[in-house]
Design a protein with these regions (language model features):
Chain A
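Primarily extracytoplasmic ectodomains and periplasmic/lumenal surface modules that are beta-strand-rich
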Residues: 11-13, 43-44, 107-109
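Glycine/small-residue-rich interface belts in oligomeric ring/scaffold proteins
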Residues: 17-79
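Residues in well-ordered beta-strands of folded domains
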Residues: 5, 55-57, 101
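Internal, well-folded beta-alpha domain core
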Residues: 59-215
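Sparse, context-dependent recognition of short Cys/His-centered cofactor- or disulfide-binding micro-motifs
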Residues: 12, 22, 41, 83-87
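Generic beta-strand structural signal
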Residues: 2, 54, 96-98
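N-terminal, Lys/Arg- and Ser/Thr-rich interaction peptides
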Residues: 1-18
Length: 215, 305
C-alpha cells in the first residue's frame, strides 16, 4: 500500500446530483482520486487499473465558501448564444490537505500496477509522459503539492488524526468509485463512512473502496 | 519525459471591484472566500481566461472574439472542425484553453441514449485569483447621475444612490502548462508573453482599472508534475511589499530546485529578490523573466520560437 500526500489550495468535489447549487463533498470521492492518480502517471485509459483500491483521508477541516459563477450548458447553437450560460452558486473548499491511500493487490489489469507506477513516477519523474495540470475535480482546482508519504513527509504528519472514507455496509456516505460522464447509467458508488484514523498508519486494505465499473 | 511550466503571479497594488457577486439591495458585492482563516476577495479563473483570450488575439487570430457592439462572443469555427485533421487550421485560444461541446443524454439510464462530447482539454490551466490581503469591508457610497440608470430610477429625476464593495489589494494566481501537448508549440511562448502583459481582468463597467500585469512572478520549468509554488506570495505590510516565506521554505527543504526557477520582480532591490538571490534563484525584471522562461521552454522543446 502506498500513501500520497496532496494539497489543493482551492477545490470543489462536486456532488454528482448537484445542479443549481453546486455543493461539494467534504473530500474527493475515490473516483476523483483514481483519476488524479491516472493523470499523475500519464495513463489515459481509465479502465487500465480497475480493481485498484483508493481511499482519501482528509487531514484538516477546510472552510467552505460560496461564490457565484458562470455555469455553461448548451441549449442553443452556436456556443456563444445567449441562454447558454447562467449564474449559479458553487461551494468552494480552501486549503485542502489530503492523504490518498492506494492498494493495487486486487487489480485485474496488466503489470505494472498503478501502485508501482505511482512509486516510479516519484522516483523518476522524467520517465513519465503525461500532460495537463494535476487537479482534483475541476481543472481550475490545481493541485499544489504531491509527495510520497514516506520518510520526512510521513514524519511531518505523524500523530495527526485524519478523516478517512472507508467502506462500511451501513455507512452514511455514498461516493462514486466510477463516473459515467455521458449518461449516468454506468456510475458506481461505494458506501462508507468518514472514520478518524491516526497517520501515517495505513487502514486495512479490505476497507479501501475498490474502483470498479459496470460490465 | 514531460515538460511542465508552472507559474505564480502577483499583481500590483490597486483598488479592485472586480468580479462581482450577487447584488444585495443596492450594494454591488465582491466575490469572497475564506482563506487562511480570513475573508479574502477572489477573481475567477474564467475572468482571467477571458482577458487572456483578448490578449492572445493580438498575437494570433482567436476562435472566440468578443464583440463590444453585440456584447457577446463571435465564433470563427464553433464546431472546432479544424481539429479533425492533422493539417487543419486551429486557433490559438482553442489550442491553449481547450473547448467542449457537450450534448446531454437523450434518455438517462440506457446506453442507447447516451450523450456525446467533443472535448479538447486545456493545455494551459489557470487557478482562481485570491487577494493577498484580507478584505476589511470597504464600501464606497456613490450616486448615479439623474437619468443615468433609468431602470433603477423609478420616478422623478433624483440621483440613484448605490454602494460598491471595493478592495485595495493585490491578487495572486497560478498556471500550469504542458507545452508539448500544443498543436503549434510556438504558442507556449505566446501564452507566457500574454500572461506577463495581461491588462484588465474582470472590472466594474469600466469604472475601475485593475492592472493584472504581474508585479512579481515565479516561473518553474520542470519535469515534476506538481507546481509546489501555487499561492506562494504573502505580505507582511498589508500588501505594500511582497514576500514569499513559503518559497524559501520549499527551497530549504529541497522540494524546489533553484535551477528550475525564474523569478521576475518590478523592484530588483526588494527583499523578495534578495532572499531568492541568496538561495541561488535567478532574479530578473518581470519582462526579462518572461523572456528567460520562453528561452528555456524553446530550448527544452527544441522548437523554433
Amino acid at each position: 500500500m502506498l500513501g500520497v500526500y496532496v494539497t489543493v489550495p482551492v477545490a470543489c468535489f462536486r456532488k454528482g446530483m448537484a445542479r443549481e447549487y453546486l455543493e461539494t463533498e467534504p473530500l474527493p470521492p475515490p473516483a476523483t482520486c483514481y483519476g488524479f492518480l491516472l493523470s499523475f502517471v500519464g495513463e489515459t485509459d481509465r479502465r487500465r487499473h480497475v480493481g485498484a483500491r483508493v481511499a482519501p483521508v482528509l487531514l484538516n477541516k477546510p472552510p467552505t465558501s460560496v461564490v457565484l459563477r458562470t455555469v455553461w450548458r448548451v441549449k442553443k447553437m452556436p456556443l456563444g448564444s445567449p441562454g447558454n450560460t447562467r449564474p449559479d452558486y458553487q461551494q468552494l473548499l480552501t486549503d485542502v490537505k489530503l492523504v490518498v491511500w492506494l492498494d493495487s493487490s486486487a487489480e485485474s489489469g496488466t503489470e505494472p500496477t498503478l501502485e508501482a507506477r505511482v512509486r516510479a513516477a516519484f522516483t523518476h519523474p522524467s520517465s513519465v509522459n503525461r500532460f495537463g495540470g494535476l487537479s482534483l475535480g475541476e481543472s481550475t482546482h490545481l493541485v499544489d503539492e504531491v509527495s510520497l508519504l514516506e520518510g520526512k513527509k510521513a514524519d511531518s504528519i505523524s500523530g495527526q488524526v485524519g478523516r478517512a472514507f472507508l467502506l462500511a455496509p451501513k455507512g452514511r456516505l455514498s461516493l462514486p468509485v466510477w463516473v459515467d460522464h455521458v449518461g449516468s447509467a454506468g456510475t458506481r458508488y461505494a458506501t462508507g463512512s468518514l472514520e478518524e484514523m491516526t497517520l501515517p498508519t495505513p487502514p486495512s486494505a479490505d476497507r479501501l473502496p475498490i474502483i470498479h465499473h459496470s460490465p | 519525459m514531460s515538460l511542465h511550466v508552472f507559474a505564480n503571479f502577483v499583481t500590483p497594488f490597486g483598488t479592485a471591484a472586480n468580479n462581482r457577486a450577487e447584488t444585495e439591495g443596492n450594494i454591488t458585492t465582491l466575490q469572497k472566500l475564506l482563506w487562511q482563516g480570513e475573508t479574502h476577495s477572489t477573481v475567477s479563473a474564467e475572468a482571467i481566461r477571458f482577458a487572456l483570450r483578448r490578449r492572445l488575439g493580438a498575437a494570433e487570430k482567436t476562435n472566440r472574439v468578443w464583440d463590444e457592439a453585440l456584447r457577446s462572443n463571435v465564433w470563427q469555427d464553433h464546431q472546432f472542425k479544424g481539429w479533425a485533421s492533422e493539417k487543419g487550421v486551429t486557433f490559438v485560444d482553442d489550442d491553449l484553453l481547450g473547448y467542449m461541446i457537450a450534448e446531454a443524454a437523450k434518455e438517462d439510464g440506457s446506453d442507447d441514449g447516451k450523450g456525446s462530447a467533443t472535448v479538447r482539454r486545456a493545455v494551459l490551466e489557470i487557478t482562481r485569483a485570491v487577494s493577498l490581503t484580507p478584505w476589511a469591508g470597504d464600501v464606497t457610497f456613490n450616486a448615479a447621475s439623474p437619468g443615468a440608470t433609468p431602470s433603477a430610477q423609478k420616478k422623478g429625476s433624483n440621483p440613484v444612490p448605490y454602494g460598491t464593495e471595493v478592495h485595495a489589494t493585490r491578487y495572486q494566481y497560478g498556471i500550469a502548462l504542458t507545452p508539448d501537448r500544443l498543436r503549434d508549440k510556438t504558442r507556449a511562448a505566446k501564452a507566457i508573453d500574454a500572461l506577463c502583459n495581461l491588462g484588465t481582468v474582470a472590472g466594474n463597467h469600466g469604472r475601475f482599472l485593475f492592472d493584472f500585469s504581474p508585479d512579481a512572478v515565479v516561473l518553474r520549468v520542470t519535469q515534476d508534475p506538481a507546481p509546489r509554488l501555487l499561492y506562494c506570495f504573502d505580505t507582511t505590510d498589508d500588501g505594500k511589499t511582497v514576500v514569499s516565506p513559503k518559497l524559501l521554505q520549499r527551497l530549504a527543504a529541497e522540494d524546489l530546485d533553484p535551477k528550475e526557477l525564474i523569478v521576475g520582480v518590478s523592484d530588483l532591490e526588494c527583499k523578495l529578490a534578495a532572499d531568492l538571490k541568496a538561495r541561488q534563484v535567478p532574479v530578473y525584471g518581470v519582462k526579462k523573466a518572461c523572456e528567460e522562461a520562453v528561452k528555456r521552454i524553446t530550448a527544452e522543446l527544441k522548437i523554433k520560437g
